[in-house]
């Protein structure tokens, strides 16, 4: 029997606000345990939550970016459960009226076609703290994360393979990152994924019993965990067994999923409206104000890069993978840069440098204007491509004008024959063996001589001019 896989994803995105959702405590990552807390986070008796308006702004922005309808009368609910990292014994979330609903995004499939994935809802909530289990036998609670604002984005069960789930996450991350509401760094926990997967015989409309997967710390692990789970479920059904509704975790070491617990239903949380927060009315003017702040998204930019600038689909995808690089590219073009040349530098030397340094393009000193100026120096013959690499590293570390640095460092390319000819004669005089080899018919000796010429000029000789002059002088021998 052949089965069809059915996948839905729940993605928690940490919102990049300065303070928490219901308290004024900082919402920064990486501080000492319990440094970013106050009496609201600790749930002292009598304290009340105060809504952070910026969180609603970000919620509206996410909903619009994901083509969602917005609940203009929005309220919060209590989700009741006990755990040490949850001092109130309940989480403030949204249950029946999330801020966004009925949305969709498009994903690109492996064959180049696109597919629309529906999004059921996006709701705002507070994050829980973090438990750490020490080797000394004690468990420690860090409430820095308690109250950090989240938006949970719940897709419909529209994905039919682990590859489609991977494509959905990639597209979703790009869109969220472009809005600026989150840095979506899985390694820091600002984007977390739970996956729901079931299988059913082909042609059957009713969904099978689903399993929820957790501990999915990268998109690749999502894909691997889903691939293992669809195989596990198929083997159970083919052997006459039944799938249990349960929560399982992905084991990175073995590539398997392991049972955590039997899955709870929403009734177990005893949701009811949050009595300490009012109903929030989101007026049309508020929505339109947020809409006006939305940037052009990757799909739109890629179409422009291919259609207007003549770049390949591959180049367009690489340049729009992050908003920072895409913005840099567009600023460089606005400064007069050539699209293909700027694209080549961003995907080549710049990308290599960023990877080696572990930085983003926003964290180095290079500006779009400086890069454009440097590329112009290559185009007009002032510097060679080889020298440009040295110039780029200087600009990345120190910033400043490419032209001024080239002049100050004495890196201007030597293209004047009157300057090059005496150096060529000196190279000939110091390399008699290569000259004799050339006279004897070994034309490869010329390569050695051009190498010596470049060495003598510290790489500043114009390669094309130098090669032409050297060949002419060799013919005179």
Curated annotation (Swiss-Prot):
Q: Which gene encodes it?
A: gatB
E.C. numbers: 6.3.5.-
MF terms per GO, please? asparaginyl-tRNA synthase (glutamine-hydrolyzing) activity; ATP binding; glutaminyl-tRNA synthase (glutamine-hydrolyzing) activity
**SMART domains membership:** GatB_Yqey
Which Cys residues form disulphide pairs? none
Q: Which Pfam families match?
A: GatB_N, GatB_Yqey
Q: What does this protein do?
A: Allows the formation of correctly charged Asn-tRNA(Asn) or Gln-tRNA(Gln) through the transamidation of misacylated Asp-tRNA(Asn) or Glu-tRNA(Gln) in organisms which lack either or both of asparaginyl-tRNA or glutaminyl-tRNA synthetases. The reaction takes place in the presence of glutamine and ATP through an activated phospho-Asp-tRNA(Asn) or phospho-Glu-tRNA(Gln).
Q: What is this protein called?
A: Aspartyl/glutamyl-tRNA(Asn/Gln) amidotransferase subunit B
GO BP, one annotated term: glutaminyl-tRNAGln biosynthesis via transamidation
Q: Which family does it belong to?
A: Belongs to the GatB/GatE family. GatB subfamily.
Q: Which reaction does it catalyse?
A: L-glutamyl-tRNA(Gln) + L-glutamine + ATP + H2O = L-glutaminyl-tRNA(Gln) + L-glutamate + ADP + phosphate + H(+); L-aspartyl-tRNA(Asn) + L-glutamine + ATP + H2O = L-asparaginyl-tRNA(Asn) + L-glutamate + ADP + phosphate + 2 H(+)
Keyword terms, alphabetized: ATP-binding, Ligase, Nucleotide-binding, Protein biosynthesis
What interactions and quaternary structure are annotated?
A: Heterotrimer of A, B and C subunits.
Query: What class does this enzyme belong to in the EC scheme?
Result: ligase
Q: Where are the transmembrane segments?
A: none
């Amino acid at each position: 029997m052949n089965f069809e896989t059915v996948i839905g994803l729940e993605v928690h995105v940490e919102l990049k606000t300065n303070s928490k959702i219901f308290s004024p405590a900082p919402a920064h990552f990486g501080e000492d345990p319990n440094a970013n807390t106050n009496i609201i986070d600790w749930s002292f008796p009598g304290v009340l939550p105060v809504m952070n308006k910026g969180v609603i702004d970000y919620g509206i922005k996410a909903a619009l970016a994901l083509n969602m309808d917005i609940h203009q009368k929005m309220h919060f609910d209590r989700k009741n459960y006990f755990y040490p990292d949850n001092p109130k014994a309940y989480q403030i979330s949204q249950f029946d009226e999330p801020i966004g609903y009925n949305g969709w995004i498009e994903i690109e499939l492996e064959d180049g076609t696109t597919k629309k994935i529906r999004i059921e809802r996006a709701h705002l909530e507070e994050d829980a703290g973090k438990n750490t289990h020490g080797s000394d036998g004690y468990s420690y609670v860090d409430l820095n994360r308690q109250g950090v604002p989240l938006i949970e984005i719940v897709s419909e069960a529209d994905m039919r393979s682990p590859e489609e789930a991977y494509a959905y996450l990639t597209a979703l991350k790009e869109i969220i990152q472009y809005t600026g509401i989150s840095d979506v760094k899985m390694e820091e926990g600002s984007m977390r994924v739970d996956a729901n997967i079931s299988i059913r015989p082909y042609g059957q409309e009713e969904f099978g019993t689903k399993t929820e997967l957790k501990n999915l710390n990268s998109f690749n692990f999502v894909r691997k965990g889903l691939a293992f789970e669809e195989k596990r479920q198929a083997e159970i059904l083919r052997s006459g067994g039944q799938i249990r509704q349960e929560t399982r975790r992905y084991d990175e070491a073995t590539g398997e999923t392991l049972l955590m617990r039997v899955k709870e239903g929403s009734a177990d949380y005893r949701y009811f409206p949050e009595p300490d927060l009012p109903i929030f009315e989101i007026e049309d003017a508020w929505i339109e104000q947020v809409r006006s702040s939305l940037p052009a998204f990757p799909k739109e930019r890629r179409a422009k890069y291919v259609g207007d600038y003549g770049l390949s689909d591959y180049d367009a995808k690489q340049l729009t993978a992050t908003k920072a690089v895409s913005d840099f590219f567009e600023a460089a073009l606005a400064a007069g840069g050539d699209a293909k040349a700027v694209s080549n530098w961003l995907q080549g030397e710049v990308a290599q440098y960023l990877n080696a340094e572990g930085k983003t393009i926003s964290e180095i000193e290079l500006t779009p204007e400086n890069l454009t100026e440097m590329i112009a120096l290559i185009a007009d013959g002032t510097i060679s491509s080889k020298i440009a690499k040295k110039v780029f590293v200087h600009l990345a570390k120190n910033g400043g004008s490419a032209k001024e640095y080239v002049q100050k460092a004495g890196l201007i390319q030597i293209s004047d024959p009157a300057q090059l000819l005496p150096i060529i004669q000196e190279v000939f005089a110091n390399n008699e063996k290569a000259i004799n080899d050339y006279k004897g018919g070994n034309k490869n000796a010329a390569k050695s001589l051009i190498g010596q010429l470049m060495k003598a000029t510290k790489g500043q000789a114009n390669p094309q001019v130098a090669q032409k002059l050297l060949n002419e002088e060799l013919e005179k021998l």
